[in-house]
């Protein structure tokens, strides 16, 4: 049965190769292919995965259970004190009740644990934490070598590549940033490691967009260290060939978008790194992302024409929507992201389509990062249509819908898994990642939310199919200009004395023209001649020829 399904998938892809299918035909074929992938995924499913899907499907219909699970991940596992953790555990049970989606034996264990935590929290809470760590061990891997290395070797034998992202404490100072940088370098030195992801905010703690140029130079120096390590400690492939290890620059906040791109381009334009192949992530939920993709593509083509190596862009939809919404609200800015999922999905398709064009893909390889089988199918067909199979790679999160990942790997001829890793003592630092994944997977419009109970032709399938077709229809017209356009250089302030009070909007330092505006004022002040300030005593003004020298403490 499974070989028949693989044959069906191959047949659909073969029908697409070197054709001139229009958008409508491509969308219809993508739906057919997604159906075949979903069926193939179900045949790939192991017993343990069926149990997990059964549990997750029940959670989708348990509103209080979802809220309890999110709150528990956020509140119970952070405190160092077992007594404090136990208090939070019991409080959440009183607030939400035992989740109804849990099987009976887990409900009983939770009640017993809550009662026992009153008397012996130092015994109960480590057990609860251990259970949580165990259940999330497929999603967040242990970074200790004796546990991580066997897993990497296992994945390698199954022709699965691994992209490692080191999680840890929040980077609040340069000491912690230095430790994180060294952790990534240590990982690159490991023979089993082929590919790492790192954010600029995890290797430099003092990102200051007002001091843009100084920040840029600091981050460039640290990125050079990573690239040098990647070049020095080459990865040995299964066929015996060696290549530099791959460093991927991750994205997080909108404010980091242009800074990350500038760091990436400037370092890779240096003679030392012209032959370095490296990657960067773009988030499709940002309207700016498509224009940034085009800019990176033109830069990469120029670099290639000057003898440089190609690059890779990993295209994701974005996982920090809640944070972007909160920041916009606090500062009274427009939200940096699109305001609805339809536009996000449309932009994602537009970016994949642009990236799959042969004249682009050869120099700028594409990483299609998605668990949405409709999106994956669309990209598979575009890849086949343009004959760019070797330049377009598919990526999924480690531990998420593994049966689906195996089916895709067979269809695509390979797979890259994004794998966060964390030390046992730093597990609490991975909670934010877990909460984001839980929030994302339980969001009503998310594909994984519906996957847990989806079959071809069911209402959940029809819902996701409609969303896919709607976004296909909009991909060529969706907005590609940024939402945040504040410009302190050109704006005019109009005061309306008859209107109600409205606070001034904070300056958005992520915008280059606002950075230049601030820099101009600083330079103007530097060149300004400070007048002599007289003493005023009893309404009389006193001046003197005697002058003193003082030091401005803000200038070292």
What are these regions, as identified by a protein language model?
Residues 2-500:
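Positively charged, amphipathic and often flexible ligand-engagement surfaces
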Residues 263, 381, 519, 542-547:
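Hydrophobic transmembrane signal anchors and adjacent membrane-proximal interface regions, especially
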């Amino acid at each position: 049965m499974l070989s028949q399904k693989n044959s069906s998938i191959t047949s659909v892809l073969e029908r697409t190769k070197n054709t001139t299918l229009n958008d409508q035909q491509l969308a219809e074929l993508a739906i057919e292919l997604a159906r075949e992938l979903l069926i193939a995924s179900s045949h790939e499913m192991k017993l343990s995965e069926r149990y997990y899907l059964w549990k997750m499907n029940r959670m989708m219909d348990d509103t209080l259970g979802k809220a309890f699970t999110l709150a528990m991940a956020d509140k119970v596992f952070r405190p160092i004190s077992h007594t404090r953790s136990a208090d939070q555990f019991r409080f959440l049970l009183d607030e939400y009740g035992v989740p109804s989606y849990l099987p009976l034996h887990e409900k009983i264990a939770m009640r017993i644990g809550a009662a026992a935590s009153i008397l012996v929290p130092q015994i109960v809470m480590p057990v609860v934490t251990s259970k949580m760590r165990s259940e999330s061990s497929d999603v967040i891997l242990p970074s200790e070598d004796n546990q991580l290395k066997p897993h990497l070797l296992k994945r390698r034998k199954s022709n699965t590549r691994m992209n490692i992202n080191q999680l840890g404490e929040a980077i609040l100072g340069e000491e912690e940033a230095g430790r994180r940088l060294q952790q990534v370098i240590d990982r690159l030195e490991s023979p089993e490691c082929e590919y790492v992801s790192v954010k600029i905010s995890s290797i430099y703690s003092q990102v200051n967009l007002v001091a843009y140029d100084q920040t840029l130079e600091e981050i460039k120096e640290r990125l050079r260290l990573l690239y040098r390590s990647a070049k020095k400690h080459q990865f040995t492939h299964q066929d015996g060939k060696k290549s530099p290890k791959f460093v991927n620059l991750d994205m997080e906040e909108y404010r980091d978008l242009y800074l990350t791109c500038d760091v990436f381009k400037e370092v890779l334009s240096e003679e030392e790194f012209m032959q370095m192949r490296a990657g960067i992530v773009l988030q499709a939920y940002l309207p700016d992302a498509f224009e940034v993709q085009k800019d990176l593509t033109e830069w990469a083509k120029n670099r290639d024409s000057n003898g440089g190596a190609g690059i890779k862009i990993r295209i994701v939809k974005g996982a920090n929507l809640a944070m972007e919404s909160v920041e916009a609200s606090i500062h009274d800015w427009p939200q940096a992201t699109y305001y609805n999922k339809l536009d996000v999905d449309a932009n994602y398709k537009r970016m994949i389509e642009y990236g799959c064009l042969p004249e682009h893909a050869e120099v700028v390889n594409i990483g299609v990062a998605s668990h949405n089988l409709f999106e994956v199918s669309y990209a598979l067909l575009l890849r086949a249509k343009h004959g760019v199979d070797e330049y377009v790679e598919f990526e999924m999160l480690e531990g998420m819908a593994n049966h689906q990942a195996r089916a895709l790997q067979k269809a695509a001829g390979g797979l890259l898994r994004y794998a966060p890793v964390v030390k046992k003592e730093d597990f609490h630092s991975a909670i934010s990642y877990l909460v984001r994944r839980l929030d994302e997977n339980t969001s009503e419009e998310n594909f994984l939310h519906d996957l847990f109970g989806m079959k071809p032709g069911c209402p959940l399938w029809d819902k996701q199919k409609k969303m896919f077709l709607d976004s296909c229809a909009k991909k060529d017209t969706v907005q590609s200009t940024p939402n945040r356009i504040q410009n302190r250089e050109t704006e005019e302030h109009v005061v309306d004395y008859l209107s109600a009070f409205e606070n001034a909007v904070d300056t958005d330092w992520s915008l280059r023209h606002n950075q230049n505006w601030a820099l101009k004022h600083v330079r103007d002040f530097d060149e300004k001649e400070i007048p002599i300030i007289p003493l005023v005593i009893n309404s009389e003004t006193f001046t003197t020829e005697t002058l003193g020298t003082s030091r401005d403490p803000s200038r070292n």
